[in-house]
């Protein structure tokens, strides 16, 4: 499949260490006890970790600042302050982490439970009891906590689409991608608006799918005709092919057959993939009649869903079907 790069830049900050405590023991029978100020807690570290079933970087937004917790100050009776909680940032497998300032690759997290401590928290300061000596019996100072560090990082992830939107030019693939995801594919009323694959992430009920909009496939694409040629090979790794056709056209059935023939001519592996047929533009004249003809022609063996992006018809049903098909793998 065509490798789509998901990239996001964020700032991470480790926690400050807590300050050491200045304290002296004061008890009923020991009014002038010695120093007993405890140490400050360490600041939280920032850790990137690979999480199972995480597919994208969609939980992060460009410009976000994410901070670990600060360590707590030391206390009397030589009690240490609590350590700051680590900030654990979950990422999908095969995520690269770069230093945004110098473009250096800091780490590559490839498999489940891989982790990388990108910033350590500041050390806690020493309490005043640590500074007592035979000469300095009552130190009235303690050590401040060490400051945390900050770093601008860029996360990069190469994605493989779950579902490829395939169809002739102007069938409405880009409009569909834009409707069901946050992608911004170019849309216009002329052929070959999409000149490169576009990617979108479809989120539904705490899960997500990666959807790709492939440039329009025309007759002869498998032999080098049109813009879809070099992208046919890139959809061989998708789980599902979503065949999008303009059901308002008089030659809708011919368009569908051309699409199937091009897939078959390119490779049987591609042709034999699980498919769903999307009959788009149900809001236009003759569409309902054509839709019924399509169902009759293809029979019950093919999964066919009629939609209208303009009227938002069938979109919810289509989204649910995408997830049902994807989870069947």
UniProtKB/Swiss-Prot annotation:
Top-level taxon of the source organism: Bacteria
Residue stretches in coiled coil: none
A molecular function (GO) term: GTPase activity
PROSITE patterns found in the cross-reference section: G_OBG, GTP1_OBG, OBG
EC number: 3.6.5.-
Family membership noted in the UniProt record: Belongs to the TRAFAC class OBG-HflX-like GTPase superfamily. OBG GTPase family.
Name under which the protein is recorded: GTPase Obg
